[in-house]
Amino acid sequence: MKTILIFLLSLVCLRATASDDPKALIRELNRKFNLVNDYTASLYMKFDVPGVKLSSMQGGVLFKRPNKFRIKAKGIFFLPKQNPMQQVSSMLLDTSAYTTVISGYEMLNGKTCAIVNIIPVKNDQELVLGKFWVDTKNILILKSQMTSRNNGTIETLSEYGSNSTYALPDKMTIQIEMKKMKVPKMMAVDLNKKSKEVVDPNKLEKGRIDLFFTNYKINTRLSDDEFKETKE
């Protein structure tokens, strides 16, 4: 009985230590990221971008390690230039490029999250600071804030389902500081035509993008040809 009690106490201590150690959390996240060599998924996108009228649309998303990424959809859509899913994973995998510290804990959707701060080692990086709310039980990023020199802060909320083993979300909500975001020229034209209100230049407007992922197919050995742009 005494041996069993000591064993159980050891397990509790190990879990507590892991949740208090940012490097242990990052290692487990990276283990999940490394399980994915490629994937495809159906994608539904909803947009709420100040001054720009964009319709919701269906499409598809493709990824192949290390950095091939493509969204297939007809029409104009607005997304950050970087792949919102793989930008985080590719950054965290390079553990020599940053230092980590846990700045506190917070409940998010009923789950205890460690707030892990990622600070780049070099001062000349585009990223200034990354903050990640990591579910300490399931080891998943539920929320992130990426602050860059040119595009301000991009905040992402993620919800997971049957593909949580691979850290692939069912839904992502992206919030963007529009004042600092570089808007594509073809969208800037729409912005000028459709926005008639006098906008306070000091007001920090935020855009919101909801991404819904279904029908994941993981590690199917995608061909590089799938990422070539085709003229329709």
Give residue spans per PLM region.
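Extended lipid/amphipathic-ligand handling interfaces
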Residues: 28, 58-64, 155-164
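Flexible, processing/modification-adjacent segments and terminal tails
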Residues: 19-27, 31-35, 53, 67-140, ...
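Sec-dependent N-terminal signal peptides
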Residues: 4-12
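Sequence/structural signature of outer-membrane beta-barrel proteins
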Residues: 48-50, 179
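A short, Trp-centered hydrophobic/proline-enriched beta-strand micro-motif
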Residues: 33-47
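Gly/Pro-enriched, hydrophobic low-complexity segments
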Residues: 112-227
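Extended beta-sheet lipid-handling architectures
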Residues: 40-43, 54-58, 71-73, 157, ...
